[in-house]
């Protein structure tokens, strides 16, 4: 009861207070709530600017004239659910703006009236009045819209005092009803009549009069366990004249099946177009012949029977089913009734809307021919249906536009044929057991399709093109990729929330250009390059992605887990293979051009060759063993050169070699011979006593005949040890073809042996000398202490003017 009262109070405040509040849009509203505080009197010191005061659910038993005197701005006063026994309306004489007064659910027995011209809502229901608390002052409240009354006796004379008022709602909240004068209710002038009945009330008379009273009639708490219609069992149900009600609502009804049958028969011949019964329980023995129901002469369009509970009764269910389906009206709802089956007459009916939700209907309901040519909406939600193709064959004989088959056990096999009407545009197939094969059993002209919470893994490519589809809901399935729109070219809304989508497909971006709304949140996204276009879509398409960006979070890779997609940065170059290749090619071309420029401008190849030679020499020196040093040598190096290059040898080569510590022993050509020895013997002796031999190569060296013998001697003398003991210095370029064929040794050396090239650029000389010193880096076994440099020169005129100079340091 408290729940009903709360709804009623809320609705009344919305209609009464807000309609008056618009007159003072600039004034500040203040609500003070003292409800459920066990107060025994109205609190003192209330703020004068209070506009709404709630004192409900307390222990107030008396109101003083001074309680609300200071609240000149008060508009809403709620005093329901207290213990007030007497009410003097004059208590509110200083509350000129009061428009809403609720004193329901108290213990009121009397009211002292005072004119409150501004009152719009007055509720005195559920009190202990002996008669209805209505006076002449009540009739003077010209702005009154909602009036709540209660009383043990209801008489015509009471309502006549307010018959001239045009009321919106009248509430009769009755605790007891000992007397009702028939014909009293029709005196009221109200749009809506709301009656809450006490136990053991003559419901029949109130229903009879209520239908004549208001456009909307709602009756609550109908308890007819013992039928009150027994006096009519052998009589014809009277036809009501002057009926006004077009909407009849019965709530919390407990009655026998015969009572329900008679209520329907009574209402059937009235002005009622919409008849709703909620929370109904019926059963018991059946006495009336239900085949005698008179279906003629009615304006009924809609019947709703919701939340039905059965007591044990002895009646064939077929009679119940046919009682409703033979009514042949536009709209019929029987929901939450635990109904296992439904029968239809053999002839065509004019039903346009059928709602059998929340029952236990099975496929058997479609196994008999059903003729519903005008049916446009069918709701079979939350039943036990299993075969989609069976439903399709039933629907093919209708004009169905909207079909709800959600929360069933439906499946579809590929070998089952489906036949849908061309008119079907909306289908709800959610919460079933459909797999991918369901796409082979869809109506061609479907526009809105809901397949959420099924077992769909992919959208098959070999399906019928649904060219009219506008909205597709695939949420809570098992998709691993965003589906493409190749078969849904006009798709505008796509929902794939809560699937197993890791990345977006290329087909989606190529074929879903028309999609305006996409919900793909709460999927385990793999934030790699495959998802880059999808991330860009979310960032730059305003309002398209539902739930962006809180519902779009990376699941893989692990280093990005928990990161929102909007915070993931995937560079274009790392995801675009073509761009990456072009970039690499461009970079390589730039580097190649830079290297070429350096080679031309800085002679880089020469530096590289010299660096390579120095490295090779350094490695060879490190590999040199003490066994290789046991050779009996007195000089570090023997220098062979032509007379033409002597200036370079004396002023460049020798000073650079001696520059380090002066301990280098050099044997070189100078022009004097050693007495007693031939030039050949002296040359061989110098080569044998020198650890390494340097040959300064130039065109003049090649033209000197003696210079070819010196490489020959050195080559053959050191060949058994290593070519590493021969050092070639190319002072000037010498093409190999310029070397005469009669001197193969020099050509062989130049082909096999890497040589040091003297740079023309003086800035490169440092690297040249470093390479040369590295090549000469070895300690003589018998060199100790301080040595004195001696020079030996030999001249041999018979060999073209070449010279051998021995520069030696003797040990002290």
Swiss-Prot record:
Any coiled-coil ranges, and where? Answer: none
Keyword Membrane found: yes
What biological-process GO terms show up in the record? cellular response to bacterial lipopeptide; inflammatory response; innate immune response; toll-like receptor signaling pathway
UniProt name for this protein: Toll-like receptor 10
Q: Which domain of life is it from?
A: Eukaryota
Q: What stretches of residues are LRR repeats?
A: 24-46, 49-70, 73-94, 97-118, 119-139, 143-166, 296-321, 325-348, 350-373, 374-395, 399-420, 423-443, 445-467, 468-489, 490-510
Which residue numbers delimit the TIR domain? 633-776
Q: Where are the transmembrane segments?
A: 578-598
Instruction: Mention any one GO cellular component term assigned to this protein in its UniProt record.
Output: receptor complex
Q: Which residues form the signal peptide?
A: 1-19
């Amino acid at each position: 009861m408290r729940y009903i009262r709360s709804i009623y109070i809320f609705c009344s405040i919305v209609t009464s207070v807000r309609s008056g509040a618009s007159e003072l849009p600039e004034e500040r509203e203040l609500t003070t709530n003292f409800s459920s505080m066990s107060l025994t009197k109205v609190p003192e010191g209330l703020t004068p600017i209070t506009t709404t005061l709630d004192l409900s659910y307390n222990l107030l038993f008396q109101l003083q004239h001074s309680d609300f005197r200071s609240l000149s701005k008060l508009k809403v006063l709620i005093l329901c659910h207290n213990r007030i026994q007497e009410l003097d309306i004059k208590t509110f004489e200083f509350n000129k703006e009061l428009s809403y007064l609720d004193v329901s659910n108290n213990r009121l027995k009397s009211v002292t009236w005072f004119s409150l011209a501004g009152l719009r809502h007055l509720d005195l229901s559920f009190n202990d009045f002996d008669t209805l608390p209505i006076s002449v002052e009540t009739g003077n409240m010209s702005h009154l819209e909602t009036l709540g009354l209660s009383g043990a006796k209801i008489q015509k004379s009471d309502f006549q005092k307010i018959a001239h008022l045009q009321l919106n709602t009248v509430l009769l909240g009755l605790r007891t009803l000992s007397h009702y004068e028939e014909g009293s209710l029709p005196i009221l002038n109200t749009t809506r009549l709301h009656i809450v009945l006490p136990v053991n009330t003559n419901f029949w008379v109130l229903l009879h009069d209520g239908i004549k009273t208001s456009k909307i009639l709602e009756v609550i708490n109908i308890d007819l366990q013992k039928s009150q219609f027994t006096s009519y069992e052998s009589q014809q149900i009277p036809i009501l004249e002057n009926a006004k009600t077009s909407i009849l609502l019965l709530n919390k009804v407990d009655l026998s099946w015969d009572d329900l049958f008679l209520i329907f028969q009574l209402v059937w011949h009235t002005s009622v177009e919409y008849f709703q019964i909620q929370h109904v329980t019926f059963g018991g023995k059946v006495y009336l012949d239900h085949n005698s129901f008179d279906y003629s002469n009615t304006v009924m369009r809609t019947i709703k029977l919701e939340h039905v509970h059965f007591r044990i009764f002895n009646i064939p269910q077929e009679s119940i089913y046919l009682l409703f389906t033979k009514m042949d009206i536009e709209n019929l709802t029987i929901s939450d009734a635990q109904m296992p089956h439904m029968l239809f007459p053999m002839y065509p009916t004019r039903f346009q809307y059928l709602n059998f939700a929340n029952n236990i209907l099975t496929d058997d309901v479609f196994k008999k021919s059903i003729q519903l040519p005008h049916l446009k909406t069918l709701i079979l939600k939350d039943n036990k249906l299993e075969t989609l193709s069976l439903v399709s064959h039933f629907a093919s004989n209708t004009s169905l536009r909207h079909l709800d088959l959600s929360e069933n056990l439906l499946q579809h096999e590929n070998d089952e044929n489906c036949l849908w009407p061309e008119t079907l545009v909306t289908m709800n197939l959610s919460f079933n057991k459909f797999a991918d094969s369901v796409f082979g059993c869809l109506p061609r002209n479907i526009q809105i399709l809901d397949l959420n919470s099924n077992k769909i893994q992919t959208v098959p490519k070999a399906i019928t093109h649904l060219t009219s589809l506008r909205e597709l809901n695939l949420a809570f399935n098992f998709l691993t990729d965003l589906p493409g729109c190749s078969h849904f070219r006009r798709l505008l809304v796509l929902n794939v929330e809560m699937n197993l989508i890791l990345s977006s497909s290329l087909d989606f971006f190529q074929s879903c250009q028309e999609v305006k709304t996409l919900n793909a949140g709460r999927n385990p996204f793999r934030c790699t390059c495959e998802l880059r276009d999808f991330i860009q879509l979310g960032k730059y398409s305003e309002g398209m992605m539902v739930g962006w960006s809180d519902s779009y979070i990376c699941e893989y890779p692990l280093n990005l887990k928990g990161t929102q997609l909007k915070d993931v940065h995937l560079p274009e170059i790392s995801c675009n293979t073509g761009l990456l290749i072009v970039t690499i090619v461009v970079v390589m071309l730039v580097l190649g051009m830079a290297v070429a420029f350096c080679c031309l401008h800085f002679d880089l190849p020469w530096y590289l060759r010299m660096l390579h030679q120095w490295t090779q020499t350094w490695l060879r020196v490190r590999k040199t063993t003490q066994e290789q040093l046991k050779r009996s040598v007195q000089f570090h190096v023997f220098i062979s050169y032509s007379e033409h290059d002597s200036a370079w040898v004396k002023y460049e080569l020798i000073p650079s070699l001696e520059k380090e510590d002066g301990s280098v022993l050099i044997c070189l050509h100078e022009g004097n011979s050693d007495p007693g020895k031939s030039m050949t013997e002296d040359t061989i002796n110098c080569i044998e006593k020198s650890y390494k031999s340097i040959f300064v190569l130039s065109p003049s060296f090649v033209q000197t005949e003696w210079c070819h013998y010196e490489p020959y001697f050195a080559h053959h003398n050191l060949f058994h040890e290593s070519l590493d003991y021969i050092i070639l210095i190319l002072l000037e370029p010498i093409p190999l073809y310029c070397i005469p064929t009669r001197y193969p040794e020099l050509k062989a050396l130049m082909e096999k042996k890497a040589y040091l090239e003297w740079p023309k650029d003086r800035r490169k000389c440092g690297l040249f000398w470093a390479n040369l010193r590295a090549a000469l880096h070895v300690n003589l076994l018998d060199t100790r202490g301080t040595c004195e440099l001696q020079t030996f020169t030999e001249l041999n005129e018979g060999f073209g003017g070449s010279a051998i100079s021995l520069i030696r340091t003797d040990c002290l």
